[in-house]
Swiss-Prot record:
Subcellular localization(s) per the UniProt record: Cellular chromatophore membrane
Protein name (database record): ATP synthase epsilon chain
Membrane-related topology note: Peripheral membrane protein
Species this protein is from: Rhodobacter capsulatus (Rhodopseudomonas capsulata)
Disulfide bonds: none
Highest classification ranks of the organism: Bacteria, Pseudomonadati, Pseudomonadota, Alphaproteobacteria, Rhodobacterales
């Protein structure tokens, strides 16, 4: 079994990362998941949160607002709705993201109100996880 797996993180705007990783921690809608080389194949929906990648260069953190991840034993591919490096996630950017999530939650149809409220709570937690 290999010691690393290919990790790619892309958003509609750009490619944020492409590295050989030994571990990728993903904020899943159904719960967080750590993928390592040899992991069983899975596709998961992402919630707003911190995605952590461990590679030979060290540990890198990325903020994602949602999206999808495809995991296999050889690679992890993340398609993020919006992705930022940890350095790019400033208090001002987080406040903008929170305002947008609140606007969506306030305007949500009753059939999706719970999901919108959960997204808002996850967005608030994102800031507290990184001390914003």
């Amino acid at each position: 079994m290999a010691d690393t797996m290919q990790f790619d993180l892309v958003s509609p705007e750009r490619r944020l990362a492409s590295v050989a990783a030994s571990e990728v921690r993903l904020p899943g809608v159904e719960g967080d998941l750590t993928a390592m080389p040899g992991h069983a194949p899975v596709i998961l929906s992402l919630r707003p949160g911190i995605l952590t990648v461990v590679s030979a260069a060290g540990t890198a953190e990325y903020a994602v607002t949602g999206g999808f991840a495809e995991v296999s034993g050889e690679k992890v591919t993340v398609l993020a709705e919006r992705g930022l490096t940890r350095a790019e996630l400033t208090a001002a950017v987080h406040a903008e993201m929170l305002a947008e999530a609140k606007k969506v939650a306030d305007a949500a149809h009753p059939s999706v109100a719970d999901a919108a409220a959960k997204m808002l709570a996850d967005m608030e937690a994102l800031g507290s996880h990184i001390n914003l």
